[in-house]
Swiss-Prot record:
Record flagged with keyword Transit peptide: no
Phosphoserine: residues bearing it: S225
Spans within the Cytoplasmic topological domain: 1-19, 86-89, 161-340, 416-523
Keyword Transmembrane helix: yes
A single GO cellular-component term on record: fungal-type vacuole membrane
Gene Ontology biological process terms from the UniProt entry: negative regulation of TORC1 signaling
Membrane topology recorded in Swiss-Prot or TrEMBL: Multi-pass membrane protein
Comp. bias (Polar residues): 242-253
Topological domains annotated Vacuolar: 41-64, 111-139, 362-394, 545-547
Location of the region described as Disordered in the Swiss-Prot/TrEMBL record: 237-271
Residue ranges crossing the lipid bilayer per the database entry: 20-40, 65-85, 90-110, 140-160, 341-361, 395-415, 524-544
UniProt keyword annotations, A-Z: Membrane, Phosphoprotein, Transmembrane, Transmembrane helix, Vacuole
Record-given protein name: Uncharacterized membrane protein YDL180W
Length: 547
């Protein structure tokens, strides 16, 4: 995705709510936020009071807006479709989203500063010297437009990655499933499959005496047949007596008129729409992430954990049927109070506003060298005059490389820990202290953990492992990835502070341990995010804008 996607959990729930007024309110607040930053650009100097300086007009600003808005789309296209970078590779995605993305932004800014010949007042004076030049207001608008493009990509790309569910403790609000159940209750009770409802929620739809094993097997075979669902153009479903399996995969309700005949082929299929369910269909073999779709949220009591300012429903590890794999669909509890809604809106403003300030500051810092024009030093700040009067290589070594590296390190320290927790622990919530008892319990409960990347994972209770020699544990690289002990550290905390380690190594271990503890807290993530964005924004303004 884009850089903002690493913090999407802080604001996507308000855009994925099932209540339209919350989504509309969120959209209005986000539009107002970007409009406020665009309006703030009027405070900057529109053009220099010098007849020989480049004076951008409305077309130049429109070109700046278009370059800033659509460049993230181009970068996203190259990243996703051309290079096909998988979201599973966390470190690689951080490298692509920050240092490489900053270099790409620098290239676009260089193209924006390309020399232009301009006719001056009266057409008598021509611009004799063509130089690379961009004014700070152009870089400012470019940064806002870039943030707007990233925000648009993030919203569109995550609309189906978040799902709102009802609070188990509060009988208010509707989820998607409850809405479907309500709709089905208002229609014919014998056609439950057309609305997406199951007998689990409406137990009195079909008499239990009519449910037989053969009918269940027939429904299962009919739904799992590729020939009936995909390749056959003359699909005639079979209608069992007093059963709704004949309408599987269809939104069309078909009456059962002939009750004496057990199977009646239906030949009127011209306007029938076949809808596939990859969970109970043979098409689940065509995707690597189908296991993630089998999250039995309605068949178990999920664990509720608070994080990112919301309450999340995560699979219950004590349930045997729980799928222990990374789940891209994050389920959050619906808003039940006005305070929760206001908190979500404030989080959205804080995170999105921080990203806008970060991109504005980056564009101002990266374009600092091209603001300078020789012979007009009195129009620029001392920082612009210092770096602009020197070579481009000096600017790259002293400003570009240190800034890009520092930006990558800080953002990695902000997001990496939370993403590792989401990936390996199947959770969006807070975790207990990593004491010996807790880790031992996690090792025992996650002994059969299978990571999506480990296709050849060998379970510890597998006969191959049990029959292996005492010196062979049968562990492969995929099993090591899912090993909770390796992720959390040694079972004995004293092993991390061995006396024979050097002082530097002990310091690094202690630093990493403190970072792991801090990076789990939302206050740390939001605090560092806002502080760094504000620092970059202020640095860019003071360095390029002559106050």
């Amino acid at each position: 995705m884009v850089r903002l996607n690493h913090a999407a959990s802080y604001f996507m729930p308000i855009f994925c709510s099932t209540r339209p007024h919350i989504v509309i309110l969120s959209a209005l607040f986000s539009i107002s936020l970007f409009s406020l930053f665009y309006a703030s650009s009027e405070l900057l100097l529109h053009q220099y009071d010098d007849p020989l300086m480049f004076k951008p007009n409305s077309q130049d600003y429109f070109r700046t807006f278009l370059l800033g808005l659509f460049s993230p789309f181009l970068y996203y296209f190259l990243k996703t479709f051309l290079f096909n970078i998988n979201q599973r590779f966390l470190i690689l995605n951080l490298i692509v989203d920050f240092p490489i993305n900053d270099v790409f932004m620098l290239l676009i800014l260089i193209g924006l500063a390309y020399p232009q010949v301009q006719d001056h007042e009266g057409g008598t004076i021509k611009h004799k010297e063509c130089s690379w030049h961009i004014i700070p207001r152009q870089a400012y608008i470019f940064g806002i437009s870039w943030a707007l493009g990233e925000f648009t990509i993030c919203i569109i790309g995550n609309l189906f990655n978040y799902q709102e569910i009802a609070d188990p403790n509060i009988n208010s609000g509707f989820t998607h499933q409850e809405s479907a159940n309500t709709y089905c209750n208002n229609n014919d009770m014998s056609h439950n499959d057309d609305c997406g409802c199951s007998t689990e929620y409406r137990p009195n739809v079909v008499d239990r005496s009519d449910i037989t094993l053969s009918k269940c097997i027939e429904v299962r075979n009919d739904s799992s047949s590729i020939s009936n669902n995909v390749y056959s153009s003359e699909y005639h479903p079979i209608k069992p007596l007093r059963s709704s399996s004949s309408t599987y995969g269809s939104i069309r309700q078909q009456p059962h008129e002939n009750k004496k005949q057990l199977h009646v082929p239906d030949n009127s299929q011209d306007d029938t729409i076949i809808m596939m369910n990859p969970i109970d269909n043979s098409l689940k073999l065509t995707t690597l992430d189908t296991g993630d779709l089998s999250f039995p949220i309605d068949e178990e009591q999920p664990i509720l954990k608070k994080s990112f300012g919301y309450t999340w429903a995560v699979p219950n590890e004590n349930t045997q049927n729980t799928t222990k794999s990374f789940t891209p669909i994050k389920r959050f509890i619906a808003f039940s109070t006005a305070y929760q809604l206001v908190t979500g809106l404030l989080l959205m403003i804080l995170v999105v506003g921080s990203n806008i300030m970060l991109t504005i500051g980056e564009s101002l810092i990266l374009s600092m060298y091209f603001v300078y024009v020789r012979g007009h030093e009195g129009l620029f700040t001392p920082v612009v005059n210092y770096f602009g009067s020197r070579t481009i290589s000096n600017f790259i070594l002293c400003v570009i490389i240190p800034f890009i590296s520092l930006n990558f390190l800080i953002n990695t320290s902000i997001y990496l820990r939370r993403e590792l927790d989401d990936w390996f622990n199947n959770s969006q919530g807070e975790f207990e202290d990593d004491d010996e008892n807790t880790i031992s319990k996690r090792v025992a409960t996650n002994q059969e953990y299978q990571h999506p990347l480990s296709a050849n994972y060998i379970s510890m209770d597998s006969p191959d492992v049990i029959n292996s020699s005492p010196g062979h544990f049968g562990m492969n690289s995929g099993q090591l990835l899912g090993n909770t002990t390796l992720y959390y550290g040694s079972l004995n905390g004293d092993d991390d502070d061995m006396t024979n380690d050097s002082a530097l190594l002990r310091f690094c271990k202690k630093l990493v341990k403190n970072w792991r503890a801090l990076a789990r807290n939302d206050s740390f993530v939001l605090g560092v995010m806002v502080s760094w964005s504000l620092l970059v924004f202020v640095t860019g303004i003071l360095s390029t804008v002559y106050i």
